[in-house]
Amino acid sequence: MTEKHTLRLADPSAIDSIISVDEFLQIKEQYDAEQPLITLQTKFNLAWALVRSDSTQHVQQGLSLFCSIYKDSPERRLECLYYIALSHYKLKQYEESRRYLNMLLSKDPNSPEALKLKNRLYDAVTKEGYIGMVVVAGAVVSVAALVGWASKRLFSKRRP
């Protein structure tokens, strides 16, 4: 029997779209208006808005809010695991993203959004690995060229 998926999560590609200033301000105004008793949904909305910002500091603040919701609201834990993983993904903290994503998939292995994020995560790690290999190869070639140049100068000065 296949388990039915019930969580409603944003597609991982939503993290690529930067939130508009107007939308962010509207959510922030709602958050500020509810002070000091902010509803869980408003807190969640602000966290998601912050994560969709192009500011690393905002993404980190959104991540912190999602972690707070995770701790304080057991009924939203699975959902928060996804958004925490997505936040770490956006920050290029791939190991942390994988850790939270695996926690979610252990509880909800059929989550289509989590499975898409897992694929994106794999692609990002693979791409980063290739870039790392190119950088290392470039450094090796540079060092070899420098050693060759230094050796040539050293040996050409010794000849009578």
UniProtKB/Swiss-Prot annotation:
Superkingdom per UniProt: Eukaryota
Gene3D superfamilies from the UniProt entry: Tetratricopeptide repeat domain
GO terms classed as biological process: mitochondrial fission; mitochondrial membrane fission; peroxisome fission
Keyword flag Membrane: yes
Segments on the Cytoplasmic side according to the record's topology features: 1-129
Chief localization: mitochondrion
Alphabetical list of InterPro entries matching this protein: Fis1, Fis1_cytosol, Fis1_TPR_C, Fis1_TPR_N, TPR-like_helical_dom_sf
Transmembrane segments: 130-150
Spans of repeat TPR: 78-111
One GO cellular component term noted in the UniProt record for this chain: cytoplasmic side of mitochondrial outer membrane
Protein name, UniProt field: Mitochondrial fission 1 protein
Organism of provenance: Schizosaccharomyces pombe (strain 972 / ATCC 24843)
